[in-house]
């Protein structure tokens, strides 16, 4: 599916896989629905979904052709409020990274908005749909418990060196490596509020697996300049955008 991303390297193929909605993401761990709710921190487990408007079927909306054509997502049907999950990804071969996340989210998920900065990436959608999306993002190859962080605020650390256990720095210490079990536990929700019980995020991926799954070009992995096709396409886009900006005839 070359239209998703150019390149002939494994990194390029991994980017295409994430962005291709027909590609089945590899499931690497199991996280319960209740634990996903705890991680997000938007509502208590078992609490009803707060709403911002009545269910669509109860609203007297004017006739609209687009509304008839587009099937609303479940949360919109129910009137859920919009909520978010935000990730940060270590530059040390994390499986995903911000711009790839945004491209992939927009290709895979309806009714969601994605926002990207250099070291963080947020996705917003209706609350019950967000929980389904978050579960998939946490359980699959999008996420590694040591090199990926769920951080609603104070996200800094993606470019810092890893600690002695291979964990990415987090000033709020939301994800902790348990040396006794060899597994990572989330002890605070994404905003930094302490959880009553830690959530088991599973074992960190080993370095070989990370190198195989990463979407990050690095000189000590697969260097971007060595991916000739990707470089040629990006240079072409840059030149055409620059020329277009000058409004050349």
Curated annotation (Swiss-Prot):
<protein>
    <recommendedName>
        <fullName>Methyl-coenzyme M reductase I subunit gamma</fullName>
        <ecNumber>2.8.4.1</ecNumber>
    </recommendedName>
</protein>
<comment type="pathway">
    <text>One-carbon metabolism; methyl-coenzyme M reduction; methane from methyl-coenzyme M: step 1/1.</text>
</comment>
<dbReference type="GO" id="GO:0005737">
    <property type="term" value="C:cytoplasm"/>
</dbReference>
<comment type="subunit">
    <text>MCR is a hexamer of two alpha, two beta, and two gamma chains, forming a dimer of heterotrimers.</text>
</comment>
<dbReference type="GO" id="GO:0050524">
    <property type="term" value="F:coenzyme-B sulfoethylthiotransferase activity"/>
</dbReference>
<dbReference type="InterPro" id="IPR009024">
    <property type="entry name" value="Me_CoM_Rdtase_Fd-like_fold"/>
</dbReference>
<keyword id="KW-0484">Methanogenesis</keyword>
<dbReference type="GO" id="GO:0015948">
    <property type="term" value="P:methanogenesis"/>
</dbReference>
<keyword id="KW-0808">Transferase</keyword>
<dbReference type="InterPro" id="IPR036994">
    <property type="entry name" value="Me_CoM_Rdtase_gsu_sf"/>
</dbReference>
<feature type="binding site">
    <location>
        <position position="120"/>
    </location>
    <ligand>
        <name>coenzyme M</name>
    </ligand>
</feature>
<comment type="function">
    <text>Component of the methyl-coenzyme M reductase (MCR) I that catalyzes the reductive cleavage of methyl-coenzyme M (CoM-S-CH3 or 2-(methylthio)ethanesulfonate) using coenzyme B (CoB or 7-mercaptoheptanoylthreonine phosphate) as reductant which results in the production of methane and the mixed heterodisulfide of CoB and CoM (CoM-S-S-CoB). This is the final step in methanogenesis. Neither N-6-mercaptohexanoylthreonine phosphate (H-S-HxoTP) nor N-8-mercaptooctanoylthreonine phosphate (H-SOcoTP) nor any other thiol compound such as CoA or CoM can substitute for CoB as the electron donor.</text>
</comment>
<dbReference type="Pfam" id="PF02240">
    <property type="entry name" value="MCR_gamma"/>
</dbReference>
<keyword id="KW-0963">Cytoplasm</keyword>
<dbReference type="InterPro" id="IPR003178">
    <property type="entry name" value="Me_CoM_Rdtase_gsu"/>
</dbReference>
<comment type="similarity">
    <text>Belongs to the methyl-coenzyme M reductase gamma subunit family.</text>
</comment>
